[in-house]
Regions:
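Long, terminal "pre-/pro-" and other extracytoplasmic accessory regions
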Residues: 6-8, 12-147
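Positively charged n-region of N-terminal signal peptides that target proteins for export
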Residues: 1-4
Length: 147
């Protein structure tokens, strides 16, 4: 029992230590910018190069939000859920640390017709305007009555 308590305490201590180190690290690629002011999501979208991201012309559902980085998984899940894709994916960013309180823009668009569904989303850093993540999916429905 004592060994188990020591192991649990040690794990908690090291997790807290690593979190503290990550928060105090001065070499963050994307530190917190929670208190900075940035343009609204609609203004940013209008100024955005449409080669980077453009909503579908006939979109059935679109999202434009300025959120904190820690809210990205929830927004991604909400978008996928509202567009009938019930799987939750993990958001993994490599080679850089992004502070949870970093402001980002989240844009998503969904379009469908009788045979096809298209989804796409993008996460863009509000300060540097660099793309942090994007995703696209396509699904084709076959007509079961055609031969």
């Amino acid at each position: 029992m004592k060994k188990m308590m020591c192991i649990i305490f040690s794990l908690c201590f090291f997790m807290h230590l690593s979190t503290t180190y990550a928060e105090s690290n001065t070499k963050l690629n994307y530190p917190s910018n929670r208190n900075k002011l940035f343009v609204s999501e609609d203004v940013f979208y209008e100024q955005l190069d449409k080669k980077i991201y453009k909503e579908y012309n006939n979109a059935a559902y679109s999202v434009r939000k300025k959120i904190l980085f820690k809210e990205v998984p929830d927004e991604e899940f909400s978008f996928l859920q509202k567009t009938a894709v019930g799987c939750r994916s993990s958001v993994v960013f490599q080679d850089s640390f992004i502070h949870p309180d970093r402001q980002v823009y989240f844009f998503a668009s969904f379009s469908q017709n009788e045979a096809d569904e298209f989804r796409k989303y993008i996460v863009i850093d509000a300060e540097t305007k660099k793309e942090l993540r994007e995703g696209k999916s396509y699904h084709h429905y076959d007509n079961p009555y055609e031969k």
